[in-house]
């Protein structure tokens, strides 16, 4: 927490940028290339599309991180968005967190399970397509 407070003081900005990519947000270009880390996690041809989208998520995140690294103290990647893409998505979540930290940003892992509709939708999508329990208050 001390590091976050210091980062807020240094930037004079208490904002946190959420990194919650969805397929609708990322441009279709660049989905063809798979980086080594992602390629190694793909076990079947069916996972290629998810892996390509995961790489697009990373490029999208990297563009945002590069644009805001001098302006805000922290980013908050929402793990459900990445988990929905399977192993490649989890790898991209990790790569995103590492890249943000390398750029000097404080990384808040948004890994809660009782969350808003878009997160619940992504969790439901990959954990159990028929139903799932979530925060009863949400």
Spell out what each predicted region is.
Residues 2-25, 29-138:
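Active-site loop-to-helix "anion-binding N-cap" substructures in soluble metabolic enzymes
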């Amino acid at each position: 927490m001390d590091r976050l407070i210091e980062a807020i003081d240094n930037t004079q900005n208490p904002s946190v940028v959420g990194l919650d990519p969805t397929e609708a947000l990322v441009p279709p270009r660049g989905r063809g290339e798979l980086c080594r880390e992602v390629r190694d996690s793909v076990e079947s041809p069916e996972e290629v599309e998810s892996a390509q989208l995961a790489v697009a998520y990373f490029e999208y995140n990297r563009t945002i991180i590069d644009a805001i690294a001098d302006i805000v103290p922290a980013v908050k990647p929402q793990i459900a968005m990445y988990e929905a893409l399977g192993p490649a998505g989890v790898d991209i979540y990790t790569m995103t967190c590492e890249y943000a930290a390398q750029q000097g940003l404080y990384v808040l892992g948004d890994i809660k399970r009782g969350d808003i509709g878009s997160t619940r939708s992504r969790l439901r999508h990959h954990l159990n397509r028929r139903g799932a329990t979530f925060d009863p208050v949400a």
